[in-house]
C-alpha cells in the first residue's frame, strides 16, 4: 500500500464518509450505520485522477460495494478498472455482495461487465450460486469463472 497519490477534495462541502458500529446485546445483532452520501468519494470525477496513478500502481483493488453505491460511482469505478488494466496494473475484485445496496440481477449485470478486466477474483460460494447462478461444487463454480474470464480465483 502506498500513499504516493493522495487526493484532496478542496470544495467547501468536502467531507469524509464514516460508519458507526453499534454493539448488539443478545438477541439483537450488532448494527452498522453508514454515512457516506455526499462524501468526497461520491463526487469523485474520473478526470481528477492523475494519469500517473494508473501507470505507477502495481495493483488496484475494489469491491462490489463500491459498484453498488450509485450510478456515478459505478461508472467512474468501471472506467478506473479499464484504465488500470490498460496500464498493466493487476486488478483485484471482491464481489462482497450486499443485498441492501442492490439486487442480485443488478450485481450480476454490472460485475459481468468488469470481469474481462479482473485478474484476481474473490467470490463467496453463496454469491456464486445466488448472484451468478452457478451450480456444482465450489471448485466447479470457480473453474467455470476461469473458463469464461481471464481471472485467478482466490476464494469461494
Predicted regions and their residues:
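Surface-exposed amphipathic alpha-helices with a cationic face
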Residues: 78-85, 146
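Glycine/threonine-rich flexible loop motifs
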Residues: 66-75, 103, 131-134
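Active-site beta-loop-alpha junctions enriched in small/polar residues
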Residues: 37, 65, 96-100, 126
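Active-site glycine-rich loop that binds ribose-phosphate moieties when present
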Residues: 42-49, 75-79, 105-110
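Conserved N-terminal subdomain of the carbohydrate kinase-like
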Residues: 1-64
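Conserved phosphate/ATP/ADP-binding segment of small-molecule kinases
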Residues: 87, 101-156
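Short beta-strand/loop segments at the ligand-binding rim of alpha/beta enzyme cores
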Residues: 87-95
Amino acid at each position: 500500500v502506498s500513499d504516493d497519490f493522495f487526493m484532496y477534495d478542496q470544495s467547501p462541502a468536502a467531507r469524509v464518509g464514516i460508519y458507526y458500529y453499534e454493539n448488539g446485546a443478545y438477541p439483537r445483532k450488532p448494527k452498522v450505520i453508514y454515512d457516506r452520501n455526499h462524501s468526497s468519494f461520491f463526487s469523485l470525477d474520473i478526470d481528477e485522477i492523475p494519469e500517473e496513478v494508473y501507470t505507477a500502481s502495481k495493483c488496484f483493488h475494489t469491491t462490489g460495494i463500491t459498484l453498488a453505491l450509485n450510478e456515478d460511482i459505478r461508472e467512474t469505478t468501471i472506467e478506473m478498472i479499464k484504465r488500470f488494466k490498460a496500464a498493466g496494473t493487476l486488478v483485484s475484485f471482491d464481489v462482497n455482495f450486499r443485498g441492501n445496496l442492490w439486487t442480485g440481477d443488478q450485481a450480476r449485470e454490472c460485475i459481468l461487465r468488469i470481469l474481462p478486466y479482473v485478474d484476481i477474483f474473490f467470490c463467496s460460494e453463496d454469491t456464486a450460486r445466488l448472484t451468478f447462478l452457478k451450480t456444482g461444487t465450489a471448485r466447479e463454480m470457480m473453474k467455470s469463472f476461469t473458463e469464461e474470464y481471464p481471472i485467478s480465483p482466490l476464494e469461494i
